[in-house]
Amino acid sequence: MDPELLVSIYASTAVSVGIILAAAGLGSALGWGLICSKYLEGIARQPEMRPQLMGQMLFTGGLMEAFPMIVLGMSMWFIFANPFTGAALAAIGS
């Protein structure tokens, strides 16, 4: 087994995981920005709806924050239990 192949697989996986985590963080930040801006717009239009809007905003934000945590778990799986190394070993017959 060529050690350079394993190094290449792990390096590509690390770069890919970094890109995936950055995209999830960016999506979460943009989502929070949109949710909060719409919340403030709703309060400006109907101030008496503030408690209901706040509850819905926090619930939606909590659901939205679950996505980066799921992505983090999947990324850790790719880093620590890399499925691509086994496939590469099987493909080259080692």
Curated annotation (Swiss-Prot):
Marked site: Reversibly protonated during proton transport: 65
PROSITE patterns (UniProt xref): ATPASE_C
Membrane-topology descriptor: Multi-pass membrane protein
Subcellular location(s) of the protein: Cell inner membrane
Subunit text: F-type ATPases have 2 components, F(1) - the catalytic core - and F(0) - the membrane proton channel. F(1) has five subunits: alpha(3), beta(3), gamma(1), delta(1), epsilon(1). F(0) has three main subunits: a(1), b(2) and c(10-14). The alpha and beta chains form an alternating ring which encloses part of the gamma chain. F(1) is attached to F(0) by a central stalk formed by the gamma and epsilon chains, while a peripheral stalk is formed by the delta and b chains.
Family membership noted in the UniProt record: Belongs to the ATPase C chain family.
Name of the featured protein: ATP synthase subunit c
Taxonomic source organism: Nitrosococcus oceani (strain ATCC 19707 / BCRC 17464 / JCM 30415 / NCIMB 11848 / C-107)
Taxonomic classification: Bacteria, Pseudomonadati, Pseudomonadota, Gammaproteobacteria, Chromatiales
